[in-house]
């Protein structure tokens, strides 16, 4: 995350920031740490789940094949970090399952549970 922050800072432009993806970072690190370090550089936020256990068992790409709350994100810590940096932008769901009314409801219900945590 330190290198990512420096990379953005090297542009010396308020128009350049980070499109932060919680699930992608969890595959290799701790999203809450990245959020604190990137801080105000975060301009957009992808809300995505990831399972390290599944990735270790069946390959890295399979870690993304889990529903919200079935992976390894520490959602209370992630939400606290987001709050700590004063982020007030959009949170974009980047999860499969919104291809039917029932799937969309499931996705929405799970996101509600995340944001209530």
What is the role of each PLM region?
Residues 1-16, 23-117:
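Histidine-acidic metal/acid-base catalytic patches
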């Amino acid at each position: 995350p330190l290198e990512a922050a420096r990379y953005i800072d090297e542009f010396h432009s308020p128009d350049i920031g980070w499109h932060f993806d919680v699930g992608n970072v969890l595959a290799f690190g701790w999203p809450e740490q990245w959020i604190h370090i990137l801080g105000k550089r975060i301009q957009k936020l992808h809300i995505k789940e990831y399972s390290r256990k599944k990735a270790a068992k069946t390959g890295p790409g399979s870690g993304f094949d889990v529903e919200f709350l079935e992976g390894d994100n520490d959602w209370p810590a992630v939400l606290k970090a987001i709050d700590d940096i004063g982020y007030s932008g959009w949170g974009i769901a980047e999860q499969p399952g919104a291809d039917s009314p029932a799937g969309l409801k499931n996705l929405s219900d799970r996101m509600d549970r995340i944001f209530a945590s």
